[in-house]
Amino acid sequence: MPIKLNASFSDSYVDVSQYRDQHFKGNRYEQEKLLKQSNTLYVGNLSFYTTEEQVYELFSKSGDVKRIIIGLDKVKKTACGFCFVEYYTRADAENAMRFVNGTRLDDRIIRTDWDAGFKEGRQYGRGKSGGQVRDEYRQDYDPARGGYGKVVARP
């Protein structure tokens, strides 16, 4: 029988961060309202090799997962280090924000944030080369995220 983590105060929502999706179609107030009602989490800093099954195994400990959308490089169609996790209820998503954010998955410290809701096309990285923007400018070598940054000149 799977273990389910429950927060003792799951009726209150976890604070919304200052990050806002620049591609959101609507104003800041509308986005804030959606974030405070959302059942969807953005998960970042994943290894390029982390599988949907690994994400499910971790996030299902906080509640019933409706679906997982793995972020893809828009050119290569390979994983590029992020995903969206959608729960059936806000309370289960709040549990994940409390208990999963900052934990280790596939030898990486992952971060979670509220997402206004997945829409088709958002599964693709927004970087110029097809992946995530932050990976294009990384100066260190990170084999789990594709090696060196693609834009930064190597010594």
Swiss-Prot record:
GO terms assigned for molecular function: mRNA binding; RNA 7-methylguanosine cap binding; snRNA binding
- The UniProt record lists the RRM domain at 39-117
The entry describes its oligomerization and partners as: Component of the nuclear cap-binding complex (CBC), a heterodimer composed of ncbp1/cbp80 and ncbp2/cbp20 that interacts with m7GpppG-capped RNA.
Biased composition range(s): Basic and acidic residues:
133-143
- What is the protein name given in its UniProt record? Nuclear cap-binding protein subunit 2
Q: What is its main location?
A: nucleus
Known role: Component of the cap-binding complex (CBC), which binds co-transcriptionally to the 5' cap of pre-mRNAs and is involved in various processes such as pre-mRNA splicing, translation regulation, nonsense-mediated mRNA decay, RNA-mediated gene silencing (RNAi) by microRNAs (miRNAs) and mRNA export. The CBC complex is involved in mRNA export from the nucleus, leading to the recruitment of the mRNA export machinery to the 5' end of mRNA and to mRNA export in a 5' to 3' direction through the nuclear pore.
One GO biological process this protein is involved in is: regulation of translation
Q: Where is the signal peptide?
A: none
Name of a matching Pfam family: RRM_1
Return the similarity comment.
Belongs to the RRM NCBP2 family.
Keyword flag Nucleus: yes
Q: Where in the cell is it found?
A: Nucleus; Cytoplasm
Name the positions where mRNA binds.
Answer: Y19, Y42, R111, T112, D113, W114, D115, R122, Q123, Y124, G125, R126, Q132, V133
Q: What are the entry keywords? A: Cytoplasm, mRNA processing, mRNA splicing, mRNA transport, Nonsense-mediated mRNA decay, Nucleus, RNA-binding, RNA-mediated gene silencing, Translation regulation, Transport
Q: Where is this region: Disordered?
A: 122-155
Q: Which organism is it from?
A: Esox lucius
Q: Name one GO cellular component term.
A: nucleus
